[in-house]
Amino acid sequence: MHGEFRKSRAMQLPRQITAGHGVLPQIAAMVRDFGLKGTGLIVWGPHTRALAGDTIAKTLSDAGYDLQTYEAGEATTETVSRAKEIAQEAKASFLIGVGGGTKIDIAKLAAHELSVPFISVPTNCAHDGIASPRATIKDDGRIRSFDADVPLGVLADTAVLIKAPWRFLAAGCADVVANKTAILDWRLAHRLRNEEFSSSAATMSEMSAEAIIQEAEFLKRNLEESAWSIVRPIIVSGVSMAIAGSSRPASGSEHLISHALDQIAPGKALHGEQCGVGSIMMMALHGGDFKRLQRCLHTVGAPTTLRQLGISKEQMVQALTTAHKVRPDRYTILGDQGIMPEAAERLLETTGVAA
């Protein structure tokens, strides 16, 4: 006779996601619908303030909300601490992150550590952190991924998103397409290490990747509908992590390679770009159709080669052979020992990434 079932887990999901043309003024209604009162802290940068921040601030001020603002730099533990200090001094009851990955991650982690709600207002789609429960923060010079909470709400204005350089939107596409290898790694860890696996989270993650792959040829620069087609899968990808209770649905060996490159060749390429190229190679290791990913990335304008990434062959070989050490607890196709330099070089040649 089987034992009594006692498994339980809480899932945090965004309460409201609003995306589309000209939705920024809906921030006041969103905050009101959430029942948020008191003072809000807006985290932005000088560029993102002009893109969307001023509209957010004016709309909330006109609606009677008291606001404090913090013009933050890069996402570091220091800027997160400063955001917390400002929020505590102002007795802020909610935070709003306006920007790309860094400003959203600063506000996200600060809100998590203060146990207050957070609203995400993206100004570009460079990666899938818009709605995820993870924050990527530089800690003592090293890039780390921190547990956080999903945003209470997401407000994504496509009229703003399409103004970002196309490189950022293409990088967001690459980050989501890389979910294909993340899921393969997760399934492998489930089979070999008995790691918990969520079919629903995996399905959402794969669905978001497929949405980009199947629409790649229709995604065009300066076409607002393209921002609409990109931001939806990016948000779904983030939500899949919330359902899984971990970043597993969207972070596998390709992300380990990206994090290794952050240390070996910092600032050379965007996170999503590195993940996209990593996914080409990892799909080949899995024995899958890596050329399908390659075609998609090429079509949307994301890098597919070392030259396009600005990474040398030696740097990528180093990343491939050391990536397994980035998160020893995260089992992937790279295994416990990693791959040999000769195998890494062969992989680069076989996939055409070395071109």
State where each predicted segment sits:
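Short glycine/serine/threonine-rich phosphate/pyrophosphate-binding segments
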Residues: 49-52, 102-109, 127-130, 250
